[in-house]
Amino acid sequence: MDKTHSSQGKCPVMHGGNTSVTTNNMDWWPKALNLDILHQHDKKTDPMDPTFNYSEAFKTLDLAAVKQDLYALMTDSQDWWPADWGHYGGLMIRMAWHSAGTYRIADGRGGAGTGNQRFAPLNSWPDNANLDKARRLLWPIKKKYGNKLSWADLIILAGNVAYESMGLKTYGFAGGRADIWHPEKDIYWGSEKQWLAPSDNPNSRYSGERDLENPLAAVMMGLIYVNPEGVDGNPDPLRTAQDIRITFARMAMDDEETVALTAGGHTVGKCHGNGKAQNLGPEPEAEDVEAQGLGWLNKHGRGVGRNTVTSGIEGAWTTHPTQWDNGYFSLLLGYDWELKKSPAGAWQWEPINIKEEDKPVDVEDPTIRHNPIMTDADMAMKMDPEYRKISEKFYKDPAYFSEVFARAWFKLTHRDLGPKSRYLGPEVPAEDLIWQDPIPQVDYRLSDDDITALKAKILASGLSIAELVTTAWDSARTFRGSDYRGGANGARIRLAPQKDWEGNEPVRLQKVLKVLTDIQTGLSQKVSIADLIVLGGTAAVEKAAQDAGVNIRVPFASGRGDASQEMTDIESFAVLEPLHDAYRNWQKKDYVVQPEELMLDRTQLMGLTAHEMTVLIGGMRVLGANYAGSAHGVFTDRVGVLSNDFFVNLTDMSYNWKPAGNNLYQIIERKTGTVKWTATRVDLVFGSNSVLRSYAEIYAQDDAKEKFVHDFVNAWTKVMNADRFDLA
């Protein structure tokens, strides 16, 4: 038979290259370290030119022109997705809300800062149903302004303009959110294997009475906040209130902000459930190519307009859903409500004996009126005693409600943008807000001669290399690239709560701070404690490198300010407390998660790569920077010298490695049986993991002594400057 003919009908692609069917390493070894979380959003996935800087591009944007286009869009109803009552405001607000609403304060991940709603899993979450249509409506505007306006900024701006177009005076808007180009790999959304799995299912995010797993804020896989029908879909406003309080607290919101956001979000727009959920097609990620990235395509009637199905709940909350007013509280508090089922079979609350004029009109026919609705979450604003007090206050004082909501909305949509120094645009509010972690600007810059003299003073102060290195590290390590909080700028390590954190070794910390403060007091020129802390670490690293035979100047840029206690929200900063730090070979207690996995999580938050993590661990060990001076992992006889000894001895087959207790190992000389060193899992993983060992071998080579020092200095400087947005 002809060979060409016999091959017809076979797959033209070798299955080894078919990513949809191949078995990858994590399938074979699911407990292996997932180093991929350290290698995201690099130039290989970024289509922009290497010199492109989004912040600089945004500065050239005509924001007023963009807003005018958005105002026009709000009432330019499209046949393929008609606007309710001829106004897209409610849809745009929901899109912006759900973009920002994934933020959680525990690890700073989620939120609106990256435009991640465009990608899986968020683009296909049940709670984000039909937001694909909102983004498609925005496409002409994104297309028009191009690279000057990111999707991340446009999504939030559209929500702001939607409110303004309906009568709310917003608090402000800041740009500066750069887009990502593929789904995030580091965010833990929960371990459930099905959408909207109830809390009694396997892999539940709940334990005990109803303890929500940290760092999660949403109550179900695929939801942004709480279940609108009630806990696990069972209506009970008081139980729902408990969920709301926990969820919003984990988003850094207090009770007043929670009521304001709930009411303000439901003052406009409507829920959609006028049909059966089974008429909806699959979510975007599961749809076929002809859907072109859209999902939830509705086969019921026209499938749009009054036939739209989204959450399954059907109706508007207020009489005038395209106007900013106090109608939410008028209806919620002015009527008694009873449970009903929507046409889609969802639980919702409807008013008893409502006046005809209080009913909102149909989205297409103004001669028809329908009952307003409330979700179980809305009823919690009435039934929970604390929420009720706030609701009544807002009802009696609409102006106060509008102000509180505008501020809470700004906080919701800007919380993960970081400090005010990252804000861009003409609508940035002048006021400094405590949740922005304000830091005073400095009015000095140290010259090279000043820096050299200060380093000499610090090294002559009697403080050890380890003391200087650990203090600088502890000050800087709180930075997290998820929401741009923490870092050495502000020197908050000298303030509550950081000065008392166990991981900061308060006694050692106060000793170092006193010496640095005395140096500061004796100077004729201005210099902040924040700068002195980092400069102390810089001087120590230079000295340790010199002692290793490598002369190198560690980069240092002055300009850090010193925050005050009044500028510091103690409760808000509590979430930044390190409970583990592999770089200092310490964790507060044993956790379910292995120490090396905790190391990866912390490393990712700090914005470091796998090889930067590797070189920093090796350097910190030989510098003697372990917590409380522990000897674990200090594979050197020259402590305080920036040598590659950690890697040389880790990869030396003259030694054998044996467990000696919980997270403790002994390094034994094979010939003599003598215990040479001790180590933890985060030390040995650099020899056991094949990828990390490949990096360790690079630094263990005979020709790597200078490369090791240079790479350590580069990674060290990156950590010290992680929060120096003024240097970017």
From Swiss-Prot:
Q: Which GO terms describe its cellular component?
A: cytosol
GO molecular-function term, one example from the UniProt record: metal ion binding
Residues that, per the record, bind heme b: H266
A biological process from GO: cellular response to hydrogen peroxide
Bound how, and how many: what does the cofactor note say?
Binds 1 heme b (iron(II)-protoporphyrin IX) group per dimer.
- The EC number on file is 1.11.1.21
**CDD domains given for it?**
catalase_peroxidase_1, catalase_peroxidase_2
Arranged from A to Z, the UniProt key words for this protein are:
Heme, Hydrogen peroxide, Iron, Metal-binding, Oxidoreductase, Peroxidase
* Reaction catalyzed: H2O2 + AH2 = A + 2 H2O; 2 H2O2 = O2 + 2 H2O
For this chain, the site of the Tryptophyl-tyrosyl-methioninium (Trp-Tyr) (with M-251) cross-link is W97-Y225
Q: How is it modified after translation?
A: Formation of the three residue Trp-Tyr-Met cross-link is important for the catalase, but not the peroxidase activity of the enzyme.
**Where in the sequence is the active site?**
H98 (proton acceptor)
Task: Point out the annotated site residues (description: Transition state stabilizer).
Answer: R94
What is the protein's known function? Bifunctional enzyme with both catalase and broad-spectrum peroxidase activity.
How is this protein organized at the quaternary level? Answer: Homodimer or homotetramer.
Family as reported in the entry's similarity comment: Belongs to the peroxidase family. Peroxidase/catalase subfamily.
Instruction: Please name the HAMAP family in this protein's record.
Output: Catal_peroxid
**Protein known as:** Catalase-peroxidase
> Which organism is this entry from?
Shewanella sp. (strain W3-18-1)
